[in-house]
A protein has these predicted regions:
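Bacterial N-terminal signal peptides
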Residues: 1-9
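Catalytic-site microenvironment of enzymes
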Residues: 9-409
């Protein structure tokens, strides 16, 4: 049963043949104290990897349960002064600020990837990012992110930045389609939910098969949107561009949006990378990215940029952050500061170098909904008794100002 699905494409072509080869570049670049601090405080705060790490006097070996040989051995620097310089493809804000200034172009030379989250268009409903709000209208986040990215690209380029968008249309970047992923989805479902295949009271073999097939199709679509598409975007960037920063663009929403309900709340959210859940840290697909991100040391740059953007959003919108703090899924970067937190999501995991996830506004707040449905426009219009400009331009200008404050010269 369920055998014989032909896979016309898979994720294998998008994944590195040796996902651990990068470790060699970081030999002797980090002390044990720094490694442990970054691992336990930021990247593996829930302890998923602790039993798989074996320490010697000057090195650590990573060998998860069930593997015959270690996946890598990392030698530590004896002290900070003796640490080798870690290789990186991106420049820090300080390095960019030291470059010769260009009049009227404060971001000259800055290389930015813009990744408008989700897809939109005819894919919006399939990716479950299309919501009809009674009395308002339908909102598709993938389309909103595209509008924002186009405005942001124009503004950044006018200030001298080089900008590479991961997409400019409401079509998937990947050539993979759900039909190509049925075997993989079936295998993952068998591994994670073996009970799902058991006969339920009142079921026939035919109805059980139909239930399983529907679920496998759903899982294949999930793999496409949450994994294959993100891998394709990051591969596209690696093949054509070397960014100093990647900005991932989303709009947020409260849980009430699931069934099209509005909320009186309206807040902003900003993420940097980290905070792998225990089950995420145990997943072989994600482990190489965890250690790459830890060793690449992009967190200080991510936090500096995200904090600047968050500050501008707070100034211009007056909105408070979603106060995640040290939660079941997130970790603070700085004690007592909640505007920016670390979280492991595909969009900031798969891109190399510093990645900032910008996720402002609650789409299901009535005023935000009306502004979104009004589209982009010149000047101001009245919303909820207030004169306000285009929400897309407000979003773009907040990001631009945040980047100028960090990188500008």
């Amino acid at each position: 049963m369920f055998m014989g699905w032909v896979v016309a494409g898979s994720l294998a072509a998008q994944e590195a043949p040796d996902p651990w080869a990068f470790v060699e570049r970081y030999q002797g670049t980090i002390t044990r104290a720094e490694f442990d601090d970054r691992l336990h405080r930021l990247f593996d705060p829930f302890g998923g990897l602790r039993s798989s790490l074996q320490y010697s006097e000057n090195a650590v070996t990573f060998q998860p349960a069930g593997t015959e040989t270690p996946l890598f051995r990392l030698e530590f620097a004896p002290d900070v002064a003796s640490s080798k310089v870690a290789p990186r493809s991106w420049r820090t804000p300080e390095e960019i600020r030291r470059a010769e200034p260009v009049e009227g172009r404060p971001l000259a030379g800055l290389r930015v990837v813009l990744d408008p989250g989700h897809i939109g268009g005819e894919w919006g409903r399939i990716e479950q990012r299309s919501t009809l709000y009674p009395g308002f209208g339908r909102v598709q986040e993938g389309d909103l992110n595209l509008i924002t990215a186009a405005l942001l690209k124009t503004r950044l380029e006018a200030l001298g930045a080089e900008v590479f968008p991961t997409r400019t249309t409401a079509e998937p970047t990947t050539s993979v389609r759900p039909e190509d992923l049925l075997d993989e989805a079936l295998a993952e479902l068998r591994e994670k939910r073996p009970d799902f295949f058991r006969m339920r009271p009142g079921e026939t073999a035919e109805s059980r098969d139909r239930r399983v097939r529907n679920r496998v199709r759903y899982e294949a679509e999930f793999v496409l949107f949450r994994r294959a598409e993100i891998l394709a975007r990051s591969a596209k960037v690696r093949a054509a561009f070397q960014p100093d920063l990647t900005v991932v663009l989303f709009f947020n929403a409260s849980p009430r949006s699931i069934d099209g309900r509005t909320t009186p709340e309206n807040r902003n959210t900003f993420f940097v990378h980290g905070s792998y859940l225990r089950e995420e840290a145990l997943w072989p697909r994600q482990q190489p990215r965890l250690f790459y991100k830890l060793l690449d040391r992009a967190t200080p740059t991510e936090f500096e940029v995200a904090r600047s953007i968050a500050t501008v959003f707070r100034e211009k919108t007056g909105l408070e952050p979603v106060r995640y703090g040290d939660s079941a899924t997130t970790r603070r970067i700085e004690p007592g500061y909640d505007d920016v937190v670390a979280r492991n999501i595909a969009a900031n995991r798969e891109h190399d170098g510093p990645v900032v996830v910008v996720e402002p506004y609650f789409m299901n707040h009535p005023s935000v909904l009306r502004r979104l449905l009004a589209g982009d426009f010149d000047g101001e219009r009245e919303f909820e008794g207030r004169m306000m400009g285009s929400i897309f331009r407000e979003y773009a200008e907040c990001v631009v100002e945040g980047l100028v404050r960090v990188y500008g010269r």
